[in-house]
Amino acid sequence: MKKQRVVVKIGSSSLADSHGGISTEQLSDHVAALARLKEDGHEVVLITSGAVAAGFSALGYPSRPVTIKGKQAAAAVGQSLLMQAYTEEFRKYGIVTAQLLLTRSDFSRKEQYSNAYATLGELLNRSALPIINENDSISLEELTFGDNDMLSALVSGLVSADMLMIFTDVNGLYDKNPQKNADAKKYYFLPEVTEEISSLAGDAGSKLGTGGMKSKIDAAKTALSLGVSVFIGTGRGQEKFVDVLKGKGDGTYVGNAPQKEMKMNKQWIALHSLVSGQIEVDAGAATAIIQHGKSLLPAGVTNVLGFFQVGEVVEVVTQQGRVIGKGQCTYSAEELRDVKGMQSQDIQVRGERHSYEVIHRDHWVSL
């Protein structure tokens, strides 16, 4: 089997004991299976939940806290305990681990996003095993990923993974809740995440079973858009992750056909950047951008909405108001208002400008 880059997401339900804390037996089982992947020459990134579960009892909570301050306090204590447990287990296999704690703002800020990309690349080149969790102890509720499922999808795209494995306590996706319906049909393979599949998931306590299944389907859809194949399921034993790569996993495979990966810069624009304004374009410019892959030139701009600076991300809309994409603008809003509708040869050179493109195609994503 050829060397692959794999992101494995392990949720709290796959780590917890009967009291809601971390099961050392479960953790050891996961580490042994991850070590087998490394032994076979694969590159591995681990996305792990479990900080709250690892820390709540040490703070005297009788059960997992439900308040934000309680969860964040438990995560602050539990993250170091969780990382210590992983490090000690991986040391038995001679594997060096590295900890990365990420927040949503690390993805929305271009420089931090690029730094995360460079750091992960260097760690993998050095044969280390990055262990990533959301920085739950400081994350603002409105700025979180929502869960580690989406974090795992975004990381899998960032590192250009071949596969994302989302491990949970349910062995795949079903058309009904298998715990309540004996005739529930399991999906062994889905070529894509359709609206029908998304609607089956619904919200917590919906048709597909556990409350976390919707987030897993949303994560799968995001990963697929970034060119990463997905597995959602469960398993035990040292061979469980290797079996997934061999097509023998106990779960559902989603979109395992080869797809074109999205470059790091375009991932940031598409999924993480904050939009600072809008540019309205005529029909000819819209066709040139979408159908022919051209850059946006000032001649095609009909209106500029908002206030933005050079390098900030803007939406591009048609004259009917339909959003067709977004990209990094090489003009400020003030500059663009001065030159909109003008031919490139008629625009006076401003400062050190070497290009007249409003948005270069390398810094554009269609929506």
Curated annotation (Swiss-Prot):
Primary localisation category: cytoplasm
Entry keyword Chloroplast: no
SMART domains: PUA
The PUA domain, residue ranges: 276-350
EC number: 2.7.2.11
Reaction catalyzed: L-glutamate + ATP = L-glutamyl 5-phosphate + ADP
Pathway where it operates: Amino-acid biosynthesis; L-proline biosynthesis; L-glutamate 5-semialdehyde from L-glutamate: step 1/2
Gene Ontology CC terms: cytosol
Main enzyme class: transferase
Entry keyword Secreted: no
Binding-site list for ATP: K9, T168, D169, T210, G211, G212, M213, K214, S215, K216
One GO BP annotation of this record: L-proline biosynthetic process
MF annotations from Gene Ontology: ATP binding; glutamate 5-kinase activity; RNA binding
Keywords: Amino-acid biosynthesis, ATP-binding, Cytoplasm, Kinase, Nucleotide-binding, Proline biosynthesis, Transferase
Alphabetical list of Pfam families matching this protein: AA_kinase, PUA
Compartments in which it is found: Cytoplasm
Sequence similarity: Belongs to the glutamate 5-kinase family.
Record protein name field: Glutamate 5-kinase
Gene behind the chain: proB
